[in-house]
Each structure stands twice: as structure tokens, then as C-alpha cells.
Design a protein with these regions (language model features):
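Alpha-helical coupling/stalk and coiled-coil linker elements that connect catalytic or binding modules
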Residues: 1, 5-35, 62-166
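Long amphipathic alpha-helical segments that form oligomerization/scaffold cores
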Residues: 39-53, 57
């Protein structure tokens, strides 16, 4: 599991970019997959203080369709404006492909640049909203990074002990 503590801490102060949101989503997916295993181990071994926080609500923010795949993109369903801008951009791109070189094509290309700029602004607004919505989940995310790190360290110590007869 990739160490994402700096990204999670950054979320407390500012908006995350698309790559950082992807990293957080991947971490949340791993936590979601590991949670039942941690619960089984905790129950079987009666370990206190070892476990993961359930972060499914945070995962649902970044995966509203609940596809549970390691990818991230801001979908058209994120806002009606975004859907409209993307549709308009696709239509303009199709016009550009059909138009011969010349003044009319340049005008359509200029409109496409303006629409793409508006699309980027809307995506930025959505990333800002997603980052703000993740903030209440930051303590659970940080806790889970610590727990996963502790378990990984314990497993490595056990491997070394086995290897060297300890």
C-alpha cells in the first residue's frame, strides 16, 4: 500500500488534484478490502488496538457509482454544467474534424478552447468540493495509515525472526 500520509494531510489545508484524489481512492479501496481481514484477525487473536476504521463513506465520495475499481475521473454526473460543457466540447471537436482549414475552423477551435477552459474551472470546483467533503474523514485515514504501517512492520519483523531463527 502506497504511503499517502502527506497527501491526506494536504487535504486538511487545500484541494487535492486529480492524481492525489486517485491515490486517496486507491488507499480507500485497499482499506475497504482489508477491513474484513483485520476484523477477523482482531477477533481471532483478541488483539486490542489493532484494526482499521471503516472508511466506506469516504470511498463513496470518490466512487459514487460504487464501481470499486482503481481509477479516478470526474464523471459527467458530477454536475449538470460539467456534463453540458463536455457535450459541447465533443460537438465542437467533431465540427473541427469535418471543417476544412480556414477562418470558420479557427473560430470553432477558439470556441473549443473557451469551452475546455470552462470545463477545467468546473472540474477544479468539483475537486475543491470533494477535498472539503473528505476532510472530516482525514483522522480515520491517518489512523488507517498508521495501522497498516504497524502491521507491515510486525510482519517484516516476524519474517526476519523466522529467517534468522529468532
Amino acid at each position: 500500500v502506497k504511503h499517502i500520509r502527506p497527501t491526506v494531510e494536504k487535504c486538511l489545508e487545500t484541494s487535492l488534484n486529480e492524481i492525489e484524489l486517485f491515490e486517496v481512492k486507491c488507499f480507500l479501496l485497499r482499506c475497504h478490502e482489508m477491513l474484513p481481514l483485520f476484523q477477523q484477525v482482531q477477533s481471532a487473536l483478541q488483539w486490542e488496538g489493532i484494526g482499521l476504521e471503516d472508511t466506506v463513506q469516504a470511498l463513496d465520495l470518490l466512487d459514487p457509482e460504487r464501481n470499486r475499481v482503481a481509477s479516478f475521473f470526474i464523471s459527467d454526473n458530477s454536475s449538470p454544467l460539467l456534463r453540458s460543457l463536455r457535450r459541447e466540447k465533443r460537438e465542437l471537436e467533431e465540427q473541427i474534424r469535418r471543417l476544412p482549414a480556414g477562418e470558420e475552423r479557427e473560430e470553432v477551435q477558439a470556441r473549443r478552447v473557451r469551452v475546455a477552459s470552462e470545463e477545467e474551472l468546473e472540474e477544479m470546483r468539483i475537486r475543491k468540493e470533494l477535498s472539503a467533503a473528505l476532510r472530516p474523514h482525514v483522522p480515520a485515514l491517518l489512523y488507517n495509515t498508521e495501522m497498516i504501517g504497524e502491521i507491515a512492520l510486525t510482519v517484516e519483523k516476524a519474517r526476519l525472526a523466522r529467517r534468522y531463527g529468532g
